Amino acid sequence: MKIIEVDEELYQYIASQTKSIGESASDILRRLLNLPVSGVNLTAVDLTQSTMNSTNEEKGTQLPAEKNVVAETPKPSSEQEIRTPARKQSTQSIQHIVTKVKNLLQSEAFQEESKMVVRFLNILSVLYRTNPESFAQATEQETSQGRTRTYYARDEATLLAAGNHTKPRQIPDTPYWVITNTNSGRKMLMLERTMQFMELPEELIDEVRPYFAVV
């Protein structure tokens, strides 16, 4: 795997093109450049100096010398998939979400709630209200290419198109709808993916997990 230094503006652009949770930077660049999908998972785009120079010669441009530095790094295993957030959140923003979610989990109403679907909707509601932009980007990943089901939508009709059995419910205080006919494990997986994309710590995800465990 190769590492190449890019400026902040270019990084933000590449990251904003994420289409699915777990999509690697290589996958994004291959799609943007209309290159065939690699047969090997997480194969990095090999941007060596010679490759970069030849590409820029075709475009009639020259890449600044300081951006040509590449370094060898070990190739990540399949368990170390690169998750590329659409926009990097500040530590303060992340901590704000963490605090709000913890307040919900520790609230008397949440602790006494017996319906798992209500807990599910309440957590999604807090995630949206604390950072609508990041939540929107996260839910888009769940409805993007590669998914066999549509989990989130901005209207009930979109989810009902897959059948009345999906039991769409509007997430409280948000413009989003979500299917609710999933089992507890799937609900937790949906929350986990969303929270990971929003860059929330694994410790917080682990605090949520027991509320969706099958007793």
Curated annotation (Swiss-Prot):
InterPro entries: Arc_rbn_hlx_hlx, Ribbon_hlx_hlx, SeqA, SeqA_DNA-bd_C, SeqA_DNA-bd_C_sf, SeqA_N
Chain positions covered by the region annotation Interaction with DNA: 181-187
Single GO MF annotation: DNA binding
Origin superkingdom: Bacteria
Positions of the UniProt region annotated as Disordered: 71-93
Keywords: Cytoplasm, DNA replication inhibitor, DNA-binding
Subcellular location: Cytoplasm
Biological process, per Gene Ontology: negative regulation of DNA-templated DNA replication initiation; regulation of DNA-templated transcription
Alphabetized SUPFAM superfamilies for the sequence: Replication modulator SeqA, C-terminal DNA-binding domain, Ribbon-helix-helix
Matching Pfam families: SeqA, SeqA_N
GO cellular component: cytoplasm
Key word Zinc-finger present: no
Subunit note: Homodimer. Polymerizes to form helical filaments.
HAMAP family the record matches: SeqA (MF_00908)
Protein function: Negative regulator of replication initiation, which contributes to regulation of DNA replication and ensures that replication initiation occurs exactly once per chromosome per cell cycle. Binds to pairs of hemimethylated GATC sequences in the oriC region, thus preventing assembly of replication proteins and re-initiation at newly replicated origins. Repression is relieved when the region becomes fully methylated.
Protein family: Belongs to the SeqA family.
Protein name listed in UniProt: Negative modulator of initiation of replication
Source organism (scientific name): Mannheimia succiniciproducens (strain KCTC 0769BP / MBEL55E)
Gene that encodes it: seqA
